[in-house]
Curated annotation (Swiss-Prot):
GO cellular component: cytoplasm
Intracellular or extracellular location(s): Cytoplasm
Gene name linked to the record: scpA
Complex and partners: Component of a cohesin-like complex composed of ScpA, ScpB and the Smc homodimer, in which ScpA and ScpB bind to the head domain of Smc. The presence of the three proteins is required for the association of the complex with DNA.
Entry similarity comment: Belongs to the ScpA family.
Name this protein carries in UniProt: Segregation and condensation protein A
One annotated GO biological process: chromosome segregation
Annotated InterPro entries: ScpA
Provenance organism: Streptococcus pyogenes serotype M5 (strain Manfredo)
Keywords, in A-Z order: Cell cycle, Cell division, Chromosome partition, Cytoplasm
Function of the protein: Participates in chromosomal partition during cell division. May act via the formation of a condensin-like complex containing Smc and ScpB that pull DNA away from mid-cell into both cell halves.
Length: 234
């Protein structure tokens, strides 16, 4: 079973997406939280054996440096640390401006194209708008946080034997069966019962497939918050 998630245009695009969730000025966002979100996303891609481009890894190393310096006891002011943060935020702000201009030009192009050709009919699951204006990528970012927490828990369990034969179809059937009884379930509650990371990943992919097929409905009421599955649409 192949699962394709909408990719970002680059590390700055991912950072801009994370920063925009706070709905405050770029220079007022909690930078350590943003860095942790970014690193969780990259780590989850690696665990799921999805390809991670080199520029994402380069940015990850820079962010880890900023985070480590942020968390160190401050005996003296670190001018270099402030410069790194300032430089990062300026890059995100500059990228935001360029992206806004690019989107405006693309919109004008699409409007002109309507006069000359019939627009292609295409359904892109990755871009589907979910309840509360959330996208599948928002769910994946939330899943990245859950995955990071679950990995920390499983590290303390040395008796677990990993399996790689979890079937997505079986997980889909299990979720549907559970929804028949409970009507509403949270993915975090399901993940708590999982014994391996492979099981967690399989359940998440099964959930995405059920959402794609409109068998279950999903909502996420807060940024990076829990993922709620419903039997019926609200």
């Amino acid at each position: 079973m192949d699962i394709k998630l909408k990719d970002f245009e680059g590390p700055l695009d991912l950072l801009l997406h994370l920063v925009s969730q706070y709905k405050v000025d770029i220079y007022e966002v909690p930078i350590v939280e943003v860095i942790e979100q970014y690193l969780n996303y990259i780590e989850t891609l690696q665990v799921m054996k999805l390809e991670v481009a080199g520029d994402y890894m380069l940015m990850a190393s820079q962010l880890m440096l900023i985070k480590s310096r942020r968390l160190l006891p401050k005996v003296v002011e670190h001018i270099e640390e402030e410069d790194l943060e300032q430089d990062l935020l300026e890059k995100i702000e500059e990228y935001s401006r360029f992206k806004a201009v690019s989107q405006a030009l693309a919109k004008q192009h699409d409007q002109r194209a309507k006069w000359y050709s019939k627009p292609k009919q295409e359904l892109i699951f990755e871009d589907a708008i979910l309840q509360e204006d959330k996208t599948v990528m928002d769910l994946f970012l939330a899943f990245s946080n859950i995955m990071a927490a679950k990995r920390a828990v499983l590290k303390n369990n040395h008796t677990v034997i990993e399996r790689d034969d979890y079937k997505i179809e079986d997980m889909m059937a299990s979720i549907k069966q559970r929804l028949e009884k409970e009507n509403v379930i949270s993915l975090s509650a399901i993940f708590e019962e999982c014994q391996t990371l492979n099981e967690v990943i399989s359940i998440f992919l099964a959930s995405l497939e059920l959402i794609k097929l409109h068998v279950v409905f999903v909502e996420q009421l807060s940024n990076f918050g829990d993922i709620i599955l419903r039997k019926e649409k609200r």
